Regions:
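Rossmann-fold NAD(P) dinucleotide-binding segment
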Residues: 12-30
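A short, aliphatic-rich alpha-helical micro-motif
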Residues: 4, 22-25, 72-73
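Rossmann-like dinucleotide-binding domain for NAD(H)/NADP(H)
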Residues: 28-169
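Single conserved hydrophobic/aromatic residue that forms the stacking wall/gate
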Residues: 1-11, 164-167
């Protein structure tokens, strides 16, 4: 079982997953946070990991980042340096949103299109879907880098690369 956060900007988002939330869980899910760091209360998540009310946690966004909780980083199965927005799609969307806001502010007609670059098509040799996905991107590699050098959170965040794809290109 898995619970993944995808909090909207419309609703209350601070500490949606707090001590009461974790204590109310009937099963022991894996918790995944890729939305906003403040959605999950760090202390409550640590308590849930310690008392085994959840199976594990995967965290990409951290409460109080870039000052991340090192104890939590050590305890999660995968912890990455808020890399979700660093994909080509994420950068294209952020650029489009910025240009939209500038055009609205200056009352400029929006007559442009922004597209994410077309990704390379890697050749993947795998016996199953899991191995195929790990050839494209293995989050454990970024997790290991962050766990080994948490003080480089911002540097690692900007340095996420997909160079391993190039090894599989035709």
């Amino acid at each position: 079982h898995c619970i993944s956060s995808a909090a909207s900007d419309v609703y209350k988002r601070q500490h949606l997953a707090d001590t009461n939330f974790f204590r109310s869980l009937k099963r022991k899910p894996v918790i995944i946070n890729t939305s906003r760091g403040e959605v999950i209360e760090t202390g409550a998540l640590l308590e849930a990991l310690d008392n085994k009310s959840i199976s594990d946690a995967i965290i990409d966004v951290w409460e109080h980042e870039p000052e991340i909780n090192l104890e939590l980083l050590r305890k999660v199965i995968i912890g990455t340096p808020h890399i979700a927005g660093y994909s080509a799609d994420g950068k294209a969307n952020a650029t489009r949103m910025s240009l939209d806001a500038i055009c609205r502010f200056f009352r400029i007609e929006r007559n442009y299109e922004i597209h994410a670059p077309v990704p390379n098509s890697p050749v993947i040799h795998a016996e199953n879907y899991e191995n195929a996905l790990l050839q494209i991107y293995n989050p454990a590699e970024d997790s290991d880098r962050l766990k080994n050098q948490p003080e480089l959170f911002e540097t690692l965040r900007g340095a996420v690369s997909y160079t391993h794809l190039r090894a599989h290109e035709t």
